[in-house]
Amino acid sequence: MNERITGAEALIKSLIAEGVDLVFGYPGGAIIPVYDKLYDYTDQLKHILVRHEQGATHAAQGYARVTGRPGVVIVTSGPAATNVITGLSDALMDSTPLVVITGQVASSFLGSDAFQETDVVGITQPITKWAYQIRRAEDIPWAVARAFYIANTGRPGPVVLDIAKDAQNGLLEWSHQKCTYIRSYIPYPKINDEDLKAAADIINSAKRPMILSGHGVMISGAEKELAAFAEKADIPVAATLLGLSTMPSDHRLYKGMLGMHGNIGPNINTNRSDVIIAIGMRFDDRVTGDTSKYAPQAKIVHIDIDSSEFDKNIKTDATIHGDAREVLEKLLPLINPADHSEWLKTFDECAKVEREKVIEREVFRTEGTMTMGEVAHKVSKATGDKAVLVTDVGQNQMFSSRYFRYTDPKSILTSGGLGTMGFGLPASIGAKMGAPERTVCFFTGDGGLQMTIQELGTIMEYGTDVKIILLNNNFLGNVRQWQELFFNSRFSQTPMVNPDFVAIANAYGIAAENVETREQLDDAIARMLNHKGAYMLNVNIDPTDMIFPMTPAGAAVDDIMLNANEKYQIN
């Protein structure tokens, strides 16, 4: 007979059996038994004490994105459980595997409005792959195994285990077996040969094809397969925001980012192409613009692990249901070698206009206050284009993702679908802990930073070496831009009165400096990157700086603003 242990200890042992060595969390009354047993396993399971439960979920997301393994969160009941809601929703939208464990009142108190009782399962079911309440200690091992299997297979996402306090204190004979099968859950479908052939026939007939590379390529680890596929058929590749770094920025076939603030070539040529091959992306509104005017001339081939995305936003001509890497491996032999050099030249022509009309004015300005684009460009260059870029949300997100260059996969972490301000600081902590050998550069604005600024305390406690670039324009810049362009410059509640960010960083033991002029910028970046430990640059940014190109919300994808007064002229 195996030794009987408590449910709390069974949880810890089950996490370790699943390969977990790092968790993010915050203790409280309904989860105290777990934290008590954690005390005995600190040599096997490191716990990161965040400063807010939302920060735990975003840190776990950062960790999961760079490692490909589920991020784990442990929090108590009530307000702690409701504080993880934003992170769960963000993880579901961006297909990030999380296992979030919440404490719960004892089973006998459920439904009585006990102290710090909330209906965690009811609240989280719409924003998770699986939410389950555990009321018996003996259910903990199998539930943990199932949670990890669901979170990290198929289209990844978050799961929640809500563990009643009596289940934590109850006794069981512990053993753990990893889950490899759940009836009615088929995470990796068998790829249909007829679907492959139908897609190949369309692709082989193309004269002006485009590949749209999404987050699914990164999740699948299909970067090499993507390159081989594109090279054989000589097809240009554009990436969604979350698909950035799935192809190196300097690859001859890589043509830039799609979307509202993407590069001109990919957006314009979406409506010039005759075949679009979408891989691991979901045609969300920030990519398509007005769906009634999206690529009406093109045949669309959609490859995705989640069949619910097919025909949801854009009507397709062929679909392949499967993992991106496996699909590309099977599709490659069916694709004919091709030469699309004339088609590729049209992207270069668009890039020339973009450089003259947008990039030169943004990145290579010599007068006036600094711009976000020039800061991002210089930081990327100073890292040899090898850093992991973590962004917050807003103008800082768009500028940094546009002007960073990517050499290696998994080099960008950002909140794409939900657009969560405050995501970046805790996510950068998780990213650095998951990839300690890589430089992590976190770009943020003065608005987003202050939403989770308390996580500077986590950086202080654990000595996390995150480079923080605060693009400080004393405005909620993205909203300000919309107000200037579309609401007659009525700047309602967007100017900000800010604290002394350098003093705040210093109070947390973090080296920091103000950067007031572009003459100071290069040396400040060098000091930041050479410093051993966290470092913050508080960079004075032109508040009138706006992110272009821009496809206005609801406009056609090729209706592109070059600046506030000029649109791209389609030939």
Q: What residues fall within each predicted segment?
A:
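A general structural motif
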Residues: 52-53, 112-114, 186-200, 258-262, ...
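Short acidic loop-to-helix transition motifs that present clustered carboxylates
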Residues: 53-58, 81, 396-398, 517-521
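Generic enzyme active-site microenvironment
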Residues: 160, 302, 390, 443-444
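Active-site diphosphate/adenylate-binding microenvironment
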Residues: 8-12, 16, 20-21, 29, ...
